[in-house]
Amino acid sequence: MAVEALLLLSFGGPERPEDVMPFLENVTRGRGVPRARLEEVAQHYLHFGGVSPINALNRDIIAGVERELDEAGIDLPVYFGNRNWHPMVEDTVAEMARDGVTGALVFPTSAWGGYSGCRQYHEDIERARAAVGPAAPHLTKLRQYFDHPLLIEAFADAIRAALERLPADRRDRARLVFTAHSVPVAADAAAGPPADGGELYSRQVADAARLCAAATGFADHDLVWQSRSGPPQVPWLEPDIVDHLEDLAGRGVDAVVVCPVGFVSDHLEVIWDLDNEAKDKAAELGMAFARASTPGTDPRFPRLVVELMREHLDGLAPRRLGAEPGYGCTIDGMPCASGCCAPQRRPAAAGR
């Protein structure tokens, strides 16, 4: 397949107050989510002026990738498309076809396996190509990158910087806590090729957390979850970050560094669930709290994207640190394997 462009594919988010409810309706379409619940989530966006930071952050990543490509002498345009808000991926793939692109690589803003972390991006690709028709370019999704050295290095430096923001007299006893987006237990059980035993998502997150902790010299750490949604009777990955802070306080912990290892950028789930809810809970408990930044704004992140591209462009050897397998690289929306990351009946995800 000829590679003539890169498509950055993401979740999407509102960029003005009047976008909030239509965006949430797109996210939850067909799931029977009550209007009252949508209005509740909308308040999270309106707290920040009705603007999700995710689109601006993705445009910054694209600018960084364009600089890296230019420095490497790689002459390829970079396109931007979203699943749930403008620019919609269907419109972007149509634009690529009009521009004469016949083949492109796709970088998803999720490093993980699982339905929402990987297979749903394959579905986005398949849907967009079907909407465009025979003129649609062939699209190759790049592999999962949860254990790429540049990602781990960026997180490790962010953890060190967060530790320095804690009061000096508490740093030596600070607890390192990693967070990632919770998913239903059944969805995690179905994550990965069936022959791989399931739970690929939580295994990869645990692997990345282990690598980051080792890189920063922490002998021990915790992995917890955040941003769950849906009916309380549906089991999701636990414990929740807020509940875990209460547990730590009960054990005498008075300082934490929280690293959102499951997130590429400081989008709404990070700045609401961690910088508001978790931070407020820590203050209530008398606990010093510092949140590590996400890697999307780190200059190493666009270098990571270009390295993944070069694995296809010039045969660059993949760089990996983890023990868990990684998948995700297929063409035109094909799943990684039969039955891989089979979709569950899902409640609405939290906002971005």
Curated annotation (Swiss-Prot):
Listed Pfam families: Ferrochelatase
GO BP terms: heme biosynthetic process
A GO-annotated cellular component: cytoplasm
Keywords, ordered alphabetically: Cytoplasm, Heme biosynthesis, Iron, Lyase, Metal-binding, Porphyrin biosynthesis
GO MF annotation list: ferrochelatase activity; metal ion binding
Pathway: Porphyrin-containing compound metabolism; protoheme biosynthesis
Annotated InterPro entries: Ferrochelatase (IPR001015), Ferrochelatase_AS (IPR019772), Ferrochelatase_C (IPR033644), Ferrochelatase_N (IPR033659)
Entry EC number(s): 4.99.1.9
Family under the similarity heading: Belongs to the ferrochelatase family.
Protein name: Coproporphyrin III ferrochelatase
Organism: Nocardia farcinica (strain IFM 10152)
